[in-house]
Amino acid sequence: EDTLTARDLLSVSIISADTHALIKSFFEAYSCISNNIYVHEGVGDINVKTIRAMVEAFAKKHQKTPVVIIDYIQILAPYQSKTVTDKQNMDKSVLELKRLARDLNAVIIGVSSLNRMSYNDAITMSAFKESGAIEYSADVLIGLQLAGVGGDKFNVEQAKQENPRKIEVKVLKNRNGPVLPSYLMYYYPADNLFVDVLEKPNALPLAQLFDPLQQQELPF
């Protein structure tokens, strides 16, 4: 499919008619869903209290609870006094997000960074940075890692130079269901695009990973 990267747009002094038409088609496609997307830039001291106030105001106004995506949780402002440690603040923030999800029956997706010691090893639940509360509080934990990481011949720099990169999706925790097999995807960095790769015999389409209607068809 035709794609344009941010670099493409910034490096073109005069946009051709074909490129202009392509950009227009992108905006038209986005306009179909844009009314359902609200973006709050992380400018200023946004913490879990701020997020809770936003979600409660939205739910009251629209009579429905939004899906909340936090990118990413390690840069949230401290929940409590700055005299406590980063880990204590992060644990408190994660626990309050869990409470928000429970109180409003909301879906909250939090993006997390990993500790640097995990870059060359297979991802585990302990890899999530600065917080054991992530491991214990989350209903579902999904990790992304370069395929082959942790192997004797794995070279992280070489793997990052590949285009596309092979990315393995690992379900580390699924509180209310089975932990499914790893899933392989291609990642195109220039386009920030993930593409399904059905190379493994037991791989599932990503949309089926947590579809309860597909549970009886899982390959185990």
What are these model-predicted stretches?
Residues D2-L10, I14-A17, K24-C32, K49-V68, ...:
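C-terminal regions of RecA-like/P-loop NTPase motor modules
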Residues N35-I37, A106:
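Short, conserved active-site loop motifs that form the nucleotide-linked donor/cofactor pocket
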Residues Y38-V39, L141:
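Conserved beta-strand scaffold positions in the cores of enzyme catalytic domains, especially
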Residues E41-T50:
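Functional beta-strand-loop-alpha-helix junction segments that form "active/interaction loops"
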Residues I51, N89-E96:
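Hydrophobic alpha-helical membrane-association signature
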Residues Y72:
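Walker B catalytic acidic pair
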Residues L76-A77, L144:
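Catalytic P-loop NTPase motifs of RecA-like helicase/translocase cores
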Residues G110-S113:
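Conserved H-loop
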